[in-house]
């Protein structure tokens, strides 16, 4: 955009950052070397050069974050310099909506990062935020997914809890289904619910959801439908949905579920929290002896996939390009800072070399029974292929899962679920004209 390419006269003294929770705020305050002081209420951060960082945090629920961000970006040109958005954060599921717009700066052309600055990052994290070769965001984290399983249940069902051996039993979907039958015979569920395996299938489609105005349902998604219907009918799952209370308790001390598909943040934060008998909020410690802490391990599972991730975007019209460049350099390209974040927080960071170093070290996770899970993540991260991502992914994936839930529970036949999916997406996206199903 014209606003973006005009040279800024002088750096502004206010840096406005928009996000939906405090995750990036804490990464910034803890690891950005230019931080001088943080306000008691955390609403502002002061940098060493006197710049005031103003945080605007709007929760994600009901599209609230995107709606408020959209309104502010529409008013960006007329806003006073100190009120203009300088940096805003986006998630993978809707990244392309912003990346493919005039509101975002090219991290190389406009902001000034170089190919060599970005060379250490995982390719898929660059692909997700690129349009026609123009990279328009950058991230400090990579979020490869793995299959997290209960060691004690694996021992009972497979005779081993060793991650390399367990992987040989789960290395493709046919084998995975065989283990589901074995687990059921011992009184265990293979998965908690309908959605658990969805991303592993949807990240491995052979073509994008939408070409022109045609929606193509990939064969791999129908494999998920068939598998989930079979698991539901045979009692291999607990009919839970992602994030519901059944799903959470299935991960805890009373759970009887073999495992969960989870990415980096999910294992270190969600799964760990759910595994404890006494939550940390009630004084419980993150240690062996509290619930099933230490009884999980991870293996690659049937297919590589990713789940989640947060990208930093520079906003067109910002008068803080030098500061934005430095934030991106330090928080997404600096190998030493990336490594430190992982060592301190277990968040998996976007630097291949730093992660390889930890992968080859004696680093281990007590939560995962002493396993070095970074080694598996490092292997998985290079296999993620996001060439089929598109701007409709979030909406179509949600509608697809919702439509087929009624089929899994026996409320409708498969043909009705297909028709309901078509109706739902045409309401959501009137511009999409037809839907093609696999033969």
Where would I find each of the regions flagged by the language model?
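Short helices/loops that flank or line small-molecule/ion binding pockets
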Residues: 66-84, 88, 101, 154, ...
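Helix-loop-helix "hinge/cap" segment bordering the ligand-binding cleft or interdomain interface
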Residues: 108-117, 126-197, 209-242, 316-322, ...
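Periplasmic-binding protein-like
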Residues: 27, 151, 328-358
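Extracytoplasmic/periplasmic substrate-binding proteins
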Residues: 33, 223-326
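Conserved N-terminal structural module of periplasmic/extracytoplasmic solute-binding proteins
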Residues: 1-96, 115, 339, 412-439
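A local structural motif
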Residues: 40-61, 80, 160-166, 229-244, ...
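Hinge/lid segment of periplasmic solute-binding proteins
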Residues: 6, 77, 90-146, 283-300, ...
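Long, aromatic- and glycine/proline-rich binding clefts that accommodate carbohydrate-like moieties
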Residues: 291-294, 342-402, 406, 434-439
